[in-house]
Amino acid sequence: MVSTLRKLGHDVQPLGVKSDLEVIRAAVEDWKPHIAFNLLEEFDGRAVYDQNVVSYLELMRIPYTGCNPRGLMLARDKALAKQVMSYHRIPYPEFMVVPLHRMVRRPKYLPFPLIVKSISEEASLGISQASIVDDDEKLRERVAFIHDNVGTGALIERYIEGRELYVGVMGNAHLQVFPVW
């Protein structure tokens, strides 16, 4: 990415941001960038904190690439995303959320098989074959696994057999849809 931008004639200053916003503030004061090319995956070891870094860029009035903090929050919170889908009448599998440190009680509207995953982590973190459960004992075990090992609430939803496809979309008023993969 850096070499391509430089070949196109742009001045580029890569910035490693682990857990210190001061790095960003100092770079902005010293270098005065026109835009921040945001490739941040996590902050302070947590993927869910990336929205806070983007909020910091907004507070500093630095234009940046990628989603705004609200988009990042919506993309991370699977239950909130499902509420937005419901509002727009987009179908999704029935689900329930088990907050951290709570016991699971499966409602009758959620028949097996089910899939259990983190409510907020991405990139399949915590998902394996064991995530697909077909009885209440395995369901309790998997929710405990998500709580104890991933450290988030658990999303339980009806399992749908098949491949999961990703579709990239870019734009606002005029959307560009990228190839499905």
Residue locations for each model-derived region?
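Phosphate-binding site of ATP-dependent enzymes
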Residues: D136-W181
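ATP-binding N-terminal substructure of ATP-dependent carboxylate-amine bond-forming enzymes
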Residues: M1-T65, P69-R70, L74-R76, Y87, ...
